[in-house]
Amino acid sequence: MTTNKKNILILSAGRRVELVQDFQAEAAKFSDGIKVLATDLNPRMSPACHVADGAFSVPPISAENYIDSIFDLALEQNIGLIIPTIDTELQKLADARRRFEEAGIHIIISDSELVTICRDKRFTASLFNRCDIATPEIYERENLTFPCFAKPYDGSRSIGAKYIHTAEDLSYDMLKDPKIIFCQYIDITNEFTEFTVDLYYDRSGRLKCAVPRERLEVRTGEVSKGATRRNGLYTLLIDKMSHLEGARGCITAQFFCKGSTVYGIEINPRFGGGFPLTYAAGGNYPGWLIREYLYGEKIPFFDEWENNLIMLRYDAKVLVHEK
């Protein structure tokens, strides 16, 4: 299925300069003059919006008219491809996906049911288990084992997560908060290695590429130093997650590994912050999305990405001349 609408819209662009640039690099390979546009609550203060071919202010994601504003903007700007980037907009977009599809606009978002599973870490654990991938045990709060790890079941970027060494570290508020779950503690400082995997699923939920990235250093929840690794985790995922019902586009999954022991931790049905490393290694997800959704092409399985490619991030700037 092709669409006459060719422009691309990256939502909540914020600081995602590299993601915008990756899409621009791929869009430039086509002869249709594809533009890569961006939205933000305050585009004037968004570096990615200044790098994009055009930028637009939209209401907060929590606003009732958020979806309507995105829909109207997409029609106005000839948008054929919409790329979500943050967790809090995913469910709304998944629920509205068919409305956009009927207008020839493709939101790269997984089915609503899968997004619901991914947004709740309790359900995510069950999904991993159905794929025959182990997960850290989730304890009943009346029967905790120490040390353990506490985190909100709908949290992201490690916000609200806390290591609990003994019962003395527990607070009343933590125990009474219905969103906090208590999990088996996995030592990623001394024993296990943390990986994020960028998985590309076609529109039928078939896995077309998987690139594991070792998280060498993390800053405020986002990888600052990472390396691609073709390892046992890669082999496992090609076998166990070759099909994921309802998955679509880039899916970012987190794992803790030690030898042949693998724990699935979470799944985010969107581009992750460390995706530019996968793109640099040859995982051309932006180009594949353009080909699959704007031009109706089939995407073949790809495993020729560069192994052991290291990414070392640094702070950069965008200068804006005020008028």
PLM features: residue spans?
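Glycine-rich phosphate/pyrophosphate-binding beta-alpha loops
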Residues: 155-158, 216-226, 268-282
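Short loop/helix-cap segments at secondary-structure boundaries that form the rim of catalytic
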Residues: 45-52, 141-146, 172-176
